[in-house]
């Protein structure tokens, strides 16, 4: 036996020796296989293979190797092979770096597989080894495998030998190596993970290789410089041309060969004579040569191009290196002789024979290649996630960082990268989060290119995997996790545009080239980019940029779509510069550091400012030029194709600089192009020479000079206009330009027509545009008014783009007095607007002249030009105009009556609304109105408003073109070097700019709370020139505007009266002030109260209807509308809605609808027609309007003509109603907040407001101001929109009552008559919802209705006797659609009569969310939100979306009406108001109804908001769903509910009330048009509402009332019609008539226990409030248990089996507390379930519990199937309590997470601020030195200072990007 053992050991030792000595790849594998077979080892058992091999091979040689390998493996990082036992790694490439990585991973215990596509190691190239590399290889036993390894002074090794050493070590350590296997690509885990849980795999060639089934967690690319794994971008480092030749000659190892000296890689430096002699003797000119002796004689030489050409190696000379060195251009024989000759000379002809070694292709091993450019990957690693499987992807070796061959960096840095990668895998296995992992890896990777043998640790013994042992000055937190988010790639990325963009943005500071920017380099780059542009000659960084053309050229070069360069005029420096500044700021986030005016006026623009500014363009664009795709913003409109465009600009991280830069552009580009074409046409072919010179200029000089002047003026006007258009790229403006002004191709054509009038084609003339925009076709009278007014008020001509109009403008004016004007066709307003532009130009030039005159340095040059311009303009306008102009500019700067809420999108208007001063208004109006004031129509009013508000002349401090709607730079602002706040000097480095103001960072504070502001998060009040933090903006704005305007109200009212009189004859309602009355609508996307500052239009895909009625004019209001409801002489039934809606829609609305609207619009007739309309006929105009207001209706509107009419009417009515407010300027107050008033709009159900309340500035200032504020927050929760009074109140801060027209008329005419059948569904009811229905009565309700005065005093809005037969309103037998809620004498429901400021808002939109929503809303109002939550909601666009959506969803759900038997509407008595006390607790809520009714009690600060969707909802949902199947009678119940409800109420005392609730699916059919993200938000919002609002709120008398029969109808959305097939059809007679029914389910419930209601209700409220509060924190009040009881069950409640639902007559029992309570519970869970059903709250009727999608009711049944069984109730109660507890905890956790995130971001912001401060201090010091202001400035080198300063600038730019990323988070 002993002999056998010895033999085995001897044999093992021999086999192992064979393995160690193997000299080829194949030989090594063969020896290894024999060894493992003989020793009975399993190489696949990687964990035990090495230990078993070690135990079986015990020879002394082997032991020496084991010792070395064990020593290496004893490092603590490896944990004896247990660090990465769960990790499987695939390494692509068997080169030195791939194998070195495999060895490290094997030491860590990972399963490692290496694939190598070759089976030979034939690379003879010799590597220079750094000392640490030699030490490392020795530690792996290199000397044991290759005895000559680094013998003596040798510090190099051939790649082949190195590969063999590492190959053998890897095999010994259990690495699985496959040769002749080629990696193709990574395969993602399949989607079907349930059946087969397959992770990441790879595709290989051959396809059937066993590795195809191998799943791995880590993949490492080590396959050379030409290959990188997908997802890594590469950067190129270019040097001067370098052509290398490598040659390998056979080494026969003779004595002669051994004597030859090697030549090191630094020969060139020390031996110049050698190269000179070589050239002289052989003609070979080399830059360098290296000779290493190894297995071959290895030569590497760097040859000069000319030498290669001279020797015939390169056949033809080409500038392109690739072409130069391609095989066809190289003579191979000459190359071989060239290499041999050089080698001979280099070795002094001592090598006896120079025979070429053969490469792996069997050819002489000589190669010539270009290493002019080297590549490096931008990132070292990334993480992919698919189907919950994570994959770590990394690069090592040349794939990661290509080396510079003479320095030996390839192997050295390759090994360092291998260690770093193994360290990362170790962290990965230990569960480090992906972002932290990537951040650390990137931090290390930044160090890698900087490593040299000198700057790494010299103590090689200490080297381990831990990077700290290798890099002396390691900062592994250099890169922050948030900077590497783009390296964490998930499938869902494309759904999140922000993340998507982040992913294509280079991480801040990862570029290692930023430090090499020098002023000279910057100049060169600028010269390259501006080459070929006319009039652009960049010779320096100062004077060359004065004209502004160079800046425009750079922008045009990369984004030609942004600037029409051809239209720019070299003489208009101010305009050009400002245009460039504005475009750069808006599109790229590059804030200006100087104004356009300063640029032009300075003899030499400030060099430092220019260097700083241009460096930002350089950083942004220095990569490959951007494709001229439309800006990334389109991504937000879900234009998927642009995703590609985005990824094509990977490094331009400025793209996202501030969220506010993202404005939806929709399809503006085509329009823009059209306009540019038009502009060019007008410019190049001045079509109307005679007309222009005679009429336009008002002088008959026909000379050439005059022609030149014409050109000049036209070009000036056109540029001004162009800039205006370009910078106000707002889509709706474009639409207005095209449609309102009637500008379009037709007009261009007509420009050549001789007659003056032909230029303004009449409406009936066919227009070429496919669908004549209805906006173009205003009745002529209207236009006349518009024209007249506009003459004085237009500024900047935002509405009149086409150039030919400039020519016509004057001629049109010269048509004469009002008589002619009155006869002008509708399109003339464009011309007149242009005249305004020209005048404005003149003013601008005058001011510029004055300013420039002060500048001595420029006086000589500029004065002359300006005089010319001024003189020319003067001659053009005639001196007669001057006084008016002056007056105009004065009055306009103060004047601007309100514009309709969503009036004009110009961000400027939205952002800026100056206080209107009435006195100035009057003169202007007097000047303009003149004789035709009586001819002014609604459209004119709107337009006037638009012009007053949105195009009023900007105070001049910037260029005239600054009318670019971007910002106004007031004259008093000071220069760019003066701080706007502290008035001290602000140096370039410390200069920030916003709204055209320049200031210090530390001075940029909220003027209320002095909080430091950031450029991405501030609000600006243009009127006062103050900056605010977003939360304070609304309050300040509202209050200040109230103060300012109180004095004006009277005069404005008088004016309005005057206008009303003028228009009374035409039946046009009061003034357009009412237009504006629509409360402030904001851009849906913007955070609720974020100011819509011009810079911050949010990129919201589509402004929604909400905008209009909503409230603040949004910066992007999609439409502006004027609705006039004539006060009416006609009876209720007649012309109820004689409304005209003037709409300018923007592209964001669906085109289909637009077209439909347009075609309908053509039929619109002048307003005075149809004095009496028996039916409510909505002018087709309304269609587009509805398009917005009910754009999101769930079902297509086109279902039937009726449908078309209806929706149109509704919004119109709403708007009309809201527009009734007399005080025009009030809206302005809200103009700025991006409150979510928008929701208000969509279906502003105009609730009957108090008829006669005068508009007091604010009934209760606190409530008004806060209400506005609150509204902003919770409009989402109020889809009921604040309309009529509320609308005005809330938005404007004071309530100006207005009654729905039909109500008003009804009042006027006594008992109402039947309403026309076509009244919009929901509209009337919405207004009448608060009305009581007395089953048998005919007139008004018997109980005494409060008089208007009383109402006013109550602050409650009440329904004025509405028309009787409400059923007719529902156009169909099914009252289901209606919305009336009948209330008992005592105010019943919260919304019944809420304080004007708030309550009204609820009812209005009842239709929207249905009562439920409404009620919820009211309930929500009671929600007490913590400040953090408020801010949270404010800050995230989500909340807006939620509002929006909520609102839309609500809007969608048309309330179903249940009318009592008589169907007569009774007037409610004292509608109740819910107090909104901010911290009201349970007891407070239980207060008597009287208290609830107190209008003033509503706490100003309180507004409910939609909290973010939290997991608790989801859980609740799931629970709820799980209960559904268990419910016994759900089917029968459903059927019961489904059956049509009785149309009459059971006869009962007047206080019987009906409640109808309907919650519509937010994501209904029409929603599909909307972007899905919004839908989600909608669901969130709706879910939240449902959760938060007590159901019982709905119709409970606030004071105990005697039990009364009540019919509660509950319309709940069904999750899908499939679920309740029975529910849908029966109630609706005609499906088409009630599209919403398709999405709604109407359920009837009776309420048995009315007596309990009041009590229940208060507890419900409190519980809800508590519940919501718990959303914020958790129930803090003492009664949670009790509440939860109320909420989730009421033991006493008796629910009758559904099947037994009693007929309505029998249902007159008191409401059972059960129902109320029950309903509530379901709400929470269900609401989360899906966007569709928001609702549920139970209006429980004893018989049935209504459920949306059966969940609620079924749940109720489940919990109380047998009212008698208390035990079941208890169980249910316990369950609910448990659920409630769990939800509370979840909510808390959610809150904590948000808090932590906020704190982390805050900390990072503070750090950034500190760093910026440090940079600023240093920058100011340098700037002073550069400007000669420092004491020692003369002694310092300016170039060096400038270089240093520029470096600081770049660093600061990085910080600012980082800061903006943080703010975006």
From Swiss-Prot:
Interacts with PLXNA4. Interacts with RAB1B. Interacts with MAPK1/ERK2. Interacts with RAB35, RAB8A, RAB10, RAB13 and RAB15 (in their GTP-bound forms); binding to RAB35 is of low affinity compared to other Rab proteins; at least in case of RAB8A may bind 2 molecules of RAB8A simultaneously through a high and a low affinity binding site, respectively. May interact with MAPK1/ERK2. Disulfide bonds: none annotated. The gene is MICAL2. Residues 1299-1338 are annotated as: Interaction with MAPK1. Residues 2-494 are annotated as: Monooxygenase domain. Residues 691-710, 1215-1245, 1277-1298 have a biased composition (Polar residues). Residues 516-619 form the Calponin-homology (CH) domain. This is [F-actin]-monooxygenase MICAL2. Residues 1589-1598, 1740-1754 have a biased composition (Low complexity). SUPFAM superfamilies: Calponin-homology domain, CH-domain, FAD/NAD(P)-binding domain, Glucocorticoid receptor-like (DNA-binding domain). It comes from Bos taurus. Its cofactor is FAD. Residues 664-676, 1048-1070, 1364-1384, 1532-1542, 1564-1578 have a biased composition (Basic and acidic residues). The lineage of its organism: Eukaryota, Metazoa, Chordata, Craniata, Vertebrata. The C-terminal RAB-binding domain (RBD) (1796-1945), also described as bivalent Mical/EHBP Rab binding (bMERB) domain, mediates binding to predominantly RAB8A, RAB10, RAB13 and RAB15 (in their GTP-bound forms).
């Amino acid at each position: 036996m002993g002999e056998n053992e010895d033999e085995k050991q001897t044999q093992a030792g021999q086999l192992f020796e064979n393995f160690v000595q193997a000299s080829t790849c194949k030989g090594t594998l063969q020896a290894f296989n024999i060894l493992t077979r003989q020793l009975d080892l399993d190489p696949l058992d990687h964990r035990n293979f090495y230990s078993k091999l070690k135990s079986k091979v015990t020879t002394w040689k082997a032991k020496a190797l084991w010792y070395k390998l064990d020593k290496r493996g004893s490092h603590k990082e490896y944990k004896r092979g247990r660090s990465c036992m769960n990790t499987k790694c695939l390494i692509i490439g068997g080169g030195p770096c791939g194998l070195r990585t495999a060895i490290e991973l094997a030491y860590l215990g990972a399963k490692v597989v290496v694939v190598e596509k070759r089976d030979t190691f034939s690379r003879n190239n010799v590597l220079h080894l750094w000392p640490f590399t030699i030490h490392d290889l020795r530690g792996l036993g290199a000397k044991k495998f290759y005895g000559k390894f680094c013998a003596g002074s040798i510090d190099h090794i051939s790649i082949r030998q190195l590969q063999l050493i590492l190959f053998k070590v890897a095999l010994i350590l259990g690495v699985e190596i496959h040769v002749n296997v080629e990696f193709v690509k990574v395969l993602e885990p399949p989607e079907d993970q349930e059946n087969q849980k397959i992770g990441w795999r790879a595709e290989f060639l051959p396809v059937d290789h066993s590795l195809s089934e191998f799943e791995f967690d880590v993949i490492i690319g080590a396959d050379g410089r030409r290959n990188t794994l997908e997802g890594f971008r590469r950067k190129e480092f270019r040097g001067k041309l370098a052509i290398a030749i490598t040659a390998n000659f056979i080494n026969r190892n003779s004595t002669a060969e051994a004597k030859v000296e090697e030549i090191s890689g630094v020969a060139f430096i020390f031996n110049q004579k050698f190269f000179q002699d070589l050239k002289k003797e052989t003609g070979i000119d080399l830059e360098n040569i290296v000779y290493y002796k190894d297995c071959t004689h290895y030569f590497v030489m760097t040859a000069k191009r000319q030498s290669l050409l001279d020797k015939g190696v390169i056949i033809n000379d080409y500038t392109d290196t690739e072409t130069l060195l391609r095989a066809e251009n190289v003579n191979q024989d000459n190359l071989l002789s060239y290499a041999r000759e050089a080698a001979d000379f280099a070795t002094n002809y001592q090598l006896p024979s120079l025979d070429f070694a053969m490469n792996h292709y069997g050819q002489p091993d000589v190669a010539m290649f270009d290493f002019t450019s080297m590549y490096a990957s931008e990132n070292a690693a990334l993480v992919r996630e698919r189907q919950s499987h994570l994959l770590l992807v990394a690069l090592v070796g040349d794939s990661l960082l290509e080396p510079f061959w003479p320095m030996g960096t390839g192997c050295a840095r390759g090994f360092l990268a291998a260690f770093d990668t193994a360290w990362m895998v170790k962290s990965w296995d230990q569960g480090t989060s992906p972002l932290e992992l990537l951040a650390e890896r990137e931090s290390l990777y930044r160090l890698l290119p900087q490593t040299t043998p000198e700057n790494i640790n010299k103590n090689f013994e200490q080297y381990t995997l831990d990077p700290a042992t290798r890099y002396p000055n390691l900062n592994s937190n250099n890169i922050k996790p948030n900077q590497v988010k783009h390296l964490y790639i998930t499938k869902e990325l494309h759904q999140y545009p922000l993340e998507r963009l982040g992913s294509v943005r280079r991480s801040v500071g990862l570029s290692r080239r930023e430090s090499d920017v020098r002023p000279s380099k910057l100049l060169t780059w600028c010269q390259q980019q501006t080459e070929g542009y006319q009039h652009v000659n960049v010779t320096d960084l100062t004077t060359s940029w004065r004209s502004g053309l160079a800046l425009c050229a750079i922008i045009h070069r990369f984004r030609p779509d942004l600037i029409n360069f051809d239209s720019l005029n070299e003489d208009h420096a101010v305009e050009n510069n400002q245009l460039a500044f504005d475009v750069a700021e808006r599109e790229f986030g590059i804030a200006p550091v100087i104004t356009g005016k300063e640029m032009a006026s300075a003899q030499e623009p400030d060099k430092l400012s220019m260097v700083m500014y241009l460096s930002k363009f350089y950083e942004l664009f220095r990569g490959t030029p951007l494709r001229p795709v439309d800006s990334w913003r389109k991504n937000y409109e879900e234009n998927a194709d642009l995703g590609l465009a985005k990824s094509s600009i990977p490094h331009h991280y400025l793209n996202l600089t501030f969220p506010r830069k993202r404005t939806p552009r929709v399809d503006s580009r085509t329009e823009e192009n059209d306009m540019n074409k038009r502009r060019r046409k007008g410019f190049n072919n001045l079509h109307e020479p005679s007309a222009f010179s005679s009429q336009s200029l008002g002088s008959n000089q026909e000379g050439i000079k005059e022609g030149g002047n014409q050109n000049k003026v036209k070009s000036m006007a056109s540029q001004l206009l162009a800039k205006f258009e370009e910078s106000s790229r707002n889509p709706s403006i474009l639409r207005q330009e095209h449609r309102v002004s009637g500008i379009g191709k037709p007009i261009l054509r007509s420009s050549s027509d001789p007659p003056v009038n032909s230029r303004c084609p009449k409406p009936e003339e066919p227009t070429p545009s496919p669908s004549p925009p209805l906006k173009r076709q205003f009745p002529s009278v209207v236009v006349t008014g518009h024209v007249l007014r506009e003459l004085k008020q237009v500024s900047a001509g935002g509405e009149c783009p086409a150039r030919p109009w400039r020519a016509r403008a004057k001629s049109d004016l010269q048509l004469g007095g009002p008589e002619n004007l009155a006869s002008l066709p509708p399109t003339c307003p464009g011309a007149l607007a242009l005249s305004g532009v020209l005048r404005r130009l003149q003013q601008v030039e005058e001011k510029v002249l004055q300013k420039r005159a002060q500048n001595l340095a420029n006086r000589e040059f500029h004065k002359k030009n300006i005089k010319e311009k001024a003189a020319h303009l003067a001659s053009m306008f005639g001196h007669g105009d001057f006084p008016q102009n002056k007056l105009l500019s004065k009055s306009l700067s103060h004047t601007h009556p309100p514009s309709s809420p969503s009036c004009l999108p110009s961000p400027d208007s939205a952002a800026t609304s100056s206080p209107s001063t009435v006195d100035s208004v009057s003169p202007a109006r007097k000047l303009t109105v003149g004789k035709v004031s009586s001819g002014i129509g609604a459209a004119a009013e709107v337009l006037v408003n638009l012009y007053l508000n949105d195009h009023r002349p900007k105070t001049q401090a910037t260029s005239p073109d600054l009318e670019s709607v971007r910002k106004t730079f007031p004259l008093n602002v000071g220069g760019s070097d003066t701080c706007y706040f502290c008035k001290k000097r602000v140096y370039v480095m410390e200069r920030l700019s916003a709204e055209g103001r320049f200031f210090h960072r530390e001075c940029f504070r909220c003027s209320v709370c002095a909080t430091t502001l950031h450029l991405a998060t501030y609000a600006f009040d243009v009127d006062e020139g103050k900056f605010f933090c977003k939360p304070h903006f609304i309050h300040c704005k509202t209050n200040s505007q109230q103060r300012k305007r109180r004095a004006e109200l009277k005069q404005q009212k008088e004016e309005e009266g005057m206008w009303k009189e003028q228009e009374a004859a035409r039946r046009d309602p009061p003034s357009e002030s009412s237009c504006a009355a629509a409360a402030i609508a904001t851009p849906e996307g913007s955070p609720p109260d974020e100011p819509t500052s011009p810079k911050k239009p949010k990129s919201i895909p589509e402004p929604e209807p909400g905008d209009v009625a909503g409230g603040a004019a949004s910066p992007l209001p999609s439409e502006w509308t004027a609705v006039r409801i004539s006060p009416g002489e006609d009876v209720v039934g007649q012309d109820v809605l004689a409304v005209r809606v003037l709409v300018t829609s923007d592209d964001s609305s669906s085109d289909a609808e637009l077209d439909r609207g347009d075609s309908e619009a053509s039929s619109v007739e002048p307003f005075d027609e149809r004095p009496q309309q028996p039916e409510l006929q909505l002018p087709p105009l309304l269609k587009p309007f509805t398009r917005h207001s009910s754009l999101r209706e769930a079902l297509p509107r086109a279902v039937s003509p009726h449908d078309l009419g209806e929706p149109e009417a509704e919004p119109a009515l709403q708007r009309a109603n809201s527009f009734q407010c007399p005080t025009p300027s009030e809206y302005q107050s809200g103009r700025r907040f991006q409150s979510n008033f928008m929701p208000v709009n969509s279906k502003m159900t105009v609730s009957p407001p108090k008829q006669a309340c005068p508009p007091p500035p604010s009934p209760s200032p606190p409530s008004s101001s806060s209400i506005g504020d609150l509204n902003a927050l919770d409009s989402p929760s109020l889809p009921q929109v604040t309309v009529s009074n509320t609308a005005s109140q809330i938005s404007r801060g004071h309530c100006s009552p207005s009654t729905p027209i039909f109500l008003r008329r009804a009042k006027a005419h006594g008992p109402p008559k039947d309403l026309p059948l076509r009244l919009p569904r929901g509209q009337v009811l919405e207004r009448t919802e608060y009305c009581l229905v007395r089953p048998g009565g005919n007139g008004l309700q018997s109980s005494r209705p409060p008089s208007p005065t009383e109402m006013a005093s109550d602050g409650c809005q009440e329904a004025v006797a509405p028309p009787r037969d409400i059923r007719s309103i529902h156009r169909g037998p099914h009252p289901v659609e209606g919305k009336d809620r009948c209330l008992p004498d005592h105010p019943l429901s919260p919304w019944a009569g809420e304080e004007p400021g708030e309550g009204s808002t609820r009812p209005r939109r009842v239709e929207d969310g249905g009562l439920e929503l409404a009620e919820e809303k009211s309930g929500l109002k009671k929600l007490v939100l913590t400040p953090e939550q408020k801010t949270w909601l404010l800050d995230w666009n989500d909340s807006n979306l939620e509002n929006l959506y909520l609102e839309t969803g609500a809007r969608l759900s048309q309330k179903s009406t249940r009318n009592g038997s008589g169907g007569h509407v009774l007037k409610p008595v004292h509608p109740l108001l819910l107090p909104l006390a901010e911290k009201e607790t349970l007891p407070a809520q239980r207060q008597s109804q009287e208290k609830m009714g107190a209008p003033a009690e509503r706490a100003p600060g309180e507004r409910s908001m939609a909290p973010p969707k939290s997991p608790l909802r989801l859980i609740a949902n799931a629970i709820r769903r799980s209960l559904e199947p268990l419910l016994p009678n759900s089917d029968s119940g459903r059927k019961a509910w489904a059956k049509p409800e009785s149309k009459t109420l059971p006869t009962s005392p007047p206080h019987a009330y009906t409640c109808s609730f309907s919650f519509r699916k937010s994501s209904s059919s029409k929603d599909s048009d909307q972007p899905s993200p919004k839908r989600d938000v909608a669901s969130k919002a709706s879910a939240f509402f449902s959760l938060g609002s007590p159901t019982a709120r709905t119709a409970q008398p606030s004071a105990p009332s005697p039990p009364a029969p009540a019919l509660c109808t509950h319309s709940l959305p069904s999750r899908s019609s499939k679920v309740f097939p029975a529910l849908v059809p029966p109630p609706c007679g005609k499906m088409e008539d009630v599209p919403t029914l398709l999405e709604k389910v109407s359920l009837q419930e009776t309420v048995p226990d009315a007596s309990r209601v009041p009590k229940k209700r208060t507890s419900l409220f409190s519980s809800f409030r508590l519940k919501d509060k718990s959303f914020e924190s958790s129930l803090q009040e003492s009664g949670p248990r009790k509440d939860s009881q109320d909420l989730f069950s009421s033991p006493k409640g008796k629910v009758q089996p559904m099947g037994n639902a009693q007929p309505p007559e029998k249902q007159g029992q008191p409401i059972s507390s059960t129902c109320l309570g029950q309903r509530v519970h379901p709400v929470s869970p269900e609401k989360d379930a899906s966007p569709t059903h928001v609702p549920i709250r139970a209006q429980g009727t004893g018989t049935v519990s209504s459920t949306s999608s059966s969940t609620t009711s079924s749940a109720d049944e489940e919990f109380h199937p047998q009212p008698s069984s208390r035990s079941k109730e208890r169980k249910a109660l316990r369950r609910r309590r448990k659920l409630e507890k769990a939800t509370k905890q979840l909510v808390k956790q959610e809150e904590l997470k948000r808090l932590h995130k906020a704190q982390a971001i805050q900390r990072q912001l503070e750090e950034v601020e500190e760093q910026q401060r440090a940079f600023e201090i240093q920058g100011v010091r340098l700037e002073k030195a550069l400007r000669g202001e420092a004491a020692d400035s003369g002694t310092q080198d300016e170039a060096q200072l400038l270089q240093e300063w520029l470096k600081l600038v770049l660093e600061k730019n990085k910080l600012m990007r980082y800061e903006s990323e943080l703010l975006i988070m």
